[in-house]
């Protein structure tokens, strides 16, 4: 059984026992988290939401909080001796999917 959930402005296809990286959640490591915005549930029978499936949820456990690799941007204007170098590390949360309730 699999589901498509919406979290952090993104849609993710998840299955039970799978680890997924989502946008940062304010939850401590080891705590349970529930995703209520389930857009689609597939498997033996499919359920399509409009926009969400009523009564469906996905439960998971937070494994890790961290930051992704650094992304460097460089802005440059020719002949003006003007340049800017900046970096950014996007925070993420790693979640182990425990169950899909549909």
Swiss-Prot record:
Coiled-coil annotated spans: none
Gene Ontology cellular component list: cytoplasm; ribonucleoprotein complex; ribosome
SUPFAM superfamilies: L21p-like
UniProt xrefs under InterPro entries: bL21-like, bL21-like_sf, Ribosomal_bL21, Ribosomal_bL21_CS
Taxonomy, superkingdom: Bacteria
Keyword vocabulary terms for this entry: Ribonucleoprotein, Ribosomal protein, RNA-binding, rRNA-binding
A molecular function GO annotation: rRNA binding
GO biological process: translation
Keyword Chaperone in record: no
Recorded family membership: Belongs to the bacterial ribosomal protein bL21 family.
NCBIfam families attached to this UniProt entry: L21
HAMAP family membership: Ribosomal_bL21
Assembly with partners or alone: Part of the 50S ribosomal subunit. Contacts protein L20.
Protein task: This protein binds to 23S rRNA in the presence of protein L20.
Protein name: Large ribosomal subunit protein bL21
Species per Swiss-Prot/TrEMBL record: Pediococcus pentosaceus (strain ATCC 25745 / CCUG 21536 / LMG 10740 / 183-1w)
């Amino acid at each position: 059984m699999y589901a498509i959930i919406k979290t952090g402005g993104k849609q993710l296809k998840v299955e039970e026992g799978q680890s997924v990286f989502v946008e940062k959640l304010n939850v401590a490591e080891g705590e349970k988290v529930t995703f209520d915005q389930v857009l689609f549930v597939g498997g033996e029978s499919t359920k399509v939401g409009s926009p969400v499936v009523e009564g469906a949820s996905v439960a998971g456990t937070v494994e890790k909080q961290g930051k992704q690799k650094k992304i460097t941007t460089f802005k440059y204007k020719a002949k003006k001796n003007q340049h800017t170098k900046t970096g950014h590390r996007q925070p993420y949360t790693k979640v182990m999917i425990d169950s899909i309730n549909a």
